[in-house]
Regions:
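Surface-exposed, low-hydrophobicity beta-strand/loop segments enriched in small/polar/acidic residues
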Residues: 1-112
Length: 112
């Protein structure tokens, strides 16, 4: 357990339309004008969906956020991409540059 919390530091949240498949805590991508959807494996994501309601979702696009992970992430600056299950994984060929400040077996705290 960490003595420090990064929760909500620098959070920038925007509201998008979304499909019924979008759920809170999953990384999403822009699928059409003003609309987000779930990412496939290796997609570059735009942010992390909050709990969607009535066809819309708040999406955190900047700041510190906790995400689920596949595989391990290196602390410090890393390139990540969607893992196809709503989380992220290390990207060997591009991805999104993020600052990883905490990592465990199945989750990490990133600064987008």
């Amino acid at each position: 357990m960490s003595k420090f919390s990064f929760e909500d530091i620098g959070a920038v949240v925007a509201t998008f339309a979304c499909g019924e498949d979008v759920t809170g805590g999953k990384v999403v991508k822009v699928t059409e004008n003003g609309t987000v959807g779930l990412c496939s494996a290796k997609d570059k994501f735009c942010g992390v969906a909050m709990e969607p309601r009535k066809g819309g979702a708040a999406v955190q696009v900047k700041g510190f956020v906790t995400v689920s992970t596949t595989g391990s992430l290196t602390l410090g600056w890393a390139n990540v991409e969607a893992d196809g299950s709503g989380g992220v994984q290390s990207s060997a060929d591009g991805g999104i540059p993020v600052l990883v400040v905490s990592a465990s077996e199945n989750s990490a705290v990133l600064c987008l």
